Amino acid sequence: DDLIEKTNSILSSPAMAPERTKACTAGRKCIYYEDCFDDAGLPDDSTLFLTTSKNKLEAYNAGAEHIKDMDPDLFEGTPLQYAQYMASRKERPFCDYFALSAWNEQIEFPISYLDFEWDTFPIPPYDEMKPFDVLCFQYSLHVEQKDGTLSHMDFFSTGDCRKHFVESVLDNIPKTGTVLVYNMEGAEKLRLQQLGQQFPEYADRLEQICSRMIDLSRPFEHGVYYNSAMRGHYSLKNLLPVFSQDYTYKDLEISDGMNAVFAYRNYDHADAQQQQIIQHAIRVYCMMDTYAEYVVYHGLLDHMRQL
């Protein structure tokens, strides 16, 4: 009875007001963060969106609502933090024109916008695979010609589709020009190198593609360009609405990579009609990724023209 009484007393007591601490976002953001705090109500240049900052909470609690209001001594001084500060101070996007121009000079037509989807297997299901190797089951490829023509190709398969995947990539990616990829080192470039190890007969041709890759994330990761509307994040999903209001991931049946993997895992267990639905949803999602790369890249070009 005493325990029940104490429990009822706790349940009837007013809820404690949530208090922001470093533990809320240390490592990964707490899964209950949105239950406690409404970041949607914060200004785009909120101090809380300052990247890789150990002192932003201290500054915010001291009354610095905007990044431009922070004590300069509290900044760690990274290039991205500088870009965020300048965007907040000037109240417009920050762009290092010369750095962005130098980056853009590397890019040559035709431009191949490339994105993969893959699953990870703790126990290797096929020959030449090691524990926790990945298997690519989907790619999307938009190819932009110098005259502005944009074409799209893709691939989807299940089972041991690695060789078919490689052959399709080699057939469809142009032999010249830039392969523009978002966050390539830990993703598409690494995947092609792994496939080259598994299929040595294709290694040289796959490495030739890797040698032409340029990472679209670099201008954002290194603070060459920053728009406060990014709110401290620079994934493709965050960048797309910054550069275009016409396209969004929100209405897609599959709207993120993990859901694409879950759908792929269920594919073989679905009936024929459901398989068509799954395949279409995965293809549309991956196609959105490469089209987002196209939109973001041209958004950078448009911004440079305005400077």
Predicted features, each with a name:
Residues 62, 114-117, 142-144, 181-183, ...:
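Generic beta-strand/beta-sheet core signal
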Residues 1-4, 152-258:
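Conserved DEDDh/DEDDy metal-dependent 3′-5′ exonuclease domain
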Residues 1-45, 239, 243-307:
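Acidic, Mg2+-coordinating catalytic module of metal-dependent nucleases/exonucleases
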Residues 78, 119-123, 148-150, 186-191, ...:
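Flexible loop/turn segments at secondary-structure boundaries
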Residues 42-86:
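Helix-hairpin-helix
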Residues 98-175, 197:
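Conserved RNase H-like, two-metal-ion catalytic cores of nucleic-acid enzymes
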